[in-house]
Amino acid sequence: MRTTISQLKEMKQNKQKIAILTAYDYPTAQILDKAGIPAILVGDSLGMVVLGYDSTVSVTMEDMLHHLKAVVRGSQKALIIADMPFMTYHLSPEQALLNAGRFIQEGGAQAVKLEGGVNVADKVKRIVDCGIPVMGHIGLTPQSVNQLSGFKVQGKTLATALSLIEDAKALEKAGAFAIVLETMPAELAAIITAGISIPTIGIGAGEECDGQVQVISDMLGMFTDFVPKHTKRYADLNGSITKAVSEYAAEVTKGAFPTLKESFTLDKKVLEELKKCVL
């Protein structure tokens, strides 16, 4: 049985931290289930860490549905949350509802995530009113990276901090079940967390959030060119995979792989008969 929205809210009430990770494929989803991760985010971050885009802006509904379906097939226990891509909910509450519905009906997600605060509250309410759980996302919102002039810490001034607090309260009022707080001062995240009844999930927002989410490629060390400040590397998969692939290539080149152990053989009698037929 999958984690429920109510269970996540109970975790906040009981001061039990919520660990969330992204996943984009079947085997990763299986591993996260096995490790006991209660919720999986199929993030539009896949645009950058899987598809090689410069930002998340280029990600489409089709991209998301393709990866979402794979994650759903691989997971049996985690709550699956799907990111709504850029321009799939911005035009109207009806557009937002239709696309959110696709993630639930076609993709098999249990919830969707939208970026924005006051400006998307009407979309959140419309989706929630139709029975689809919504996670909010404020602070650094990657889909607005061009407007924000890059991936920068948000809420560092009094005005912007107050604006983010207003965003959080608007999302709670609209019916969001949780809110991602991304790349903001830890003190501000703590104030927001204490001021709302729904769970806050931090990414670069300090330790006082009700839970944390990380991009799995970052925390597993898949890339060497960039490591976000908010990420702790729990493995060096880039190094491990590079070493393994190099060893494989070297063994193939010198004829050390495959050996008899990795090969299949014919019955001796069949082999003898075969040789008579072809030699």
Swiss-Prot record:
Active site: residue positions: 182
UniProt keyword Magnesium present: yes
EC number(s) stated in the UniProt entry for this protein: 2.1.2.11
Protein location: Cytoplasm
GO biological process: pantothenate biosynthetic process
InterPro entries reported for this sequence: Pantoate_hydroxy_MeTrfase (IPR003700), Pyrv/PenolPyrv_kinase-like_dom (IPR015813), Pyrv_kinase-like_dom_sf (IPR040442)
Co-factor requirement: Mg(2+)
Bound cofactor: record note: Binds 1 Mg(2+) ion per subunit.
Record: residues binding 3-methyl-2-oxobutanoate: 44-45, 83, 113
Residues annotated for Mg(2+) binding in this entry: 44, 83, 115
Catalytic reactions of this protein: 3-methyl-2-oxobutanoate + (6R)-5,10-methylene-5,6,7,8-tetrahydrofolate + H2O = 2-dehydropantoate + (6S)-5,6,7,8-tetrahydrofolate
Family under the similarity heading: Belongs to the PanB family.
Subunit structure: Homodecamer; pentamer of dimers.
Protein name: 3-methyl-2-oxobutanoate hydroxymethyltransferase
Organism, as annotated: Dehalococcoides mccartyi (strain CBDB1)
